[in-house]
Design a protein with these regions (language model features):
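N-terminal intrinsically disordered, low-complexity segments enriched in P/E/S/T
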Residues: 1-19, 93-97, 124-125, 130, ...
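N-terminal domain-onset segments
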Residues: 1-79
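Extracytosolic secretory-pathway proteins
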Residues: 25-37, 90-94, 164-165, 169-171, ...
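Short N-terminal edge-element motif at the start of the domain
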Residues: 43-135
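Internal, well-folded beta-alpha domain core
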Residues: 103-177
Length: 177
């Protein structure tokens, strides 16, 4: 059972709008899975200047959601202008660990989704995240059926297990309208 917007104090931060120059774009094919984790454990994933949004309800009071995204970004391109892109040909697999319903410390209001770590199997994609401040790590990423694994040959497993992917959450095309 996923904790929802109604369970937290605050509100969504409206998107800034489309990137018209200087950004990157691509197609994301992937799976999202949610888990409720002990709030204290989740709060330790955040940097000092961020906090978990205060709870509005007593629904699952000691838990906070985390998101795991397993995906294969394709069709990567630099956004050169509002009407022109430069294809990069990049394709890779990744796993992203994110924490929704996060606020800047000592500030009420807008929620952010904090990206804790991104594991990617492409060195160029890892390097491409540096200017944006992403915590990207080069790793092997595999997800087939219910099984998923993220590992490094020297560091060992970062994550391994069988997941229950569940039902479709919503139509992604509806989010674009």
């Amino acid at each position: 059972e996923f904790l929802r917007e109604a369970d937290f104090e605050g509100h969504p931060v409206p998107p800034a709008g489309a990137v018209t120059t200087g950004g990157l774009q691509g197609t994301y094919n992937g799976i999202l899975t949610f888990a409720n984790v002990d709030r204290e454990t989740v709060s330790q994933l955040l940097p000092n200047n961020f906090q978990l949004a205060p709870r509005k309800t007593n629904h699952l009071p000691n838990l906070h959601p985390v998101v795991l995204m397993f995906g294969d970004p394709t069709d990567g391109a630099f956004v050169v202008s509002p009407t022109a892109t430069q294809p990069t040909g990049i394709h890779y697999s990744e796993m992203i660990l994110a924490v929704p319903f996060v606020q800047k410390s000592n500030q009420s209001g807008g929620w952010h989704t904090y990206i804790v770590r991104m594991y990617l199997d492409n060195a160029a994609a890892v390097a491409g995240g540096i200017p944006y401040g992403y915590q990207k790590v080069l790793a092997s990423v595999e997800w087939k059926g219910r099984y998923a694994r993220v590992w490094d040959t020297l560091a060992g497993d970062y994550l391994e297990g069988d997941f229950r992917w569940g039902e479709h959450w919503y139509d992604g095309n509806a989010a674009l309208t």
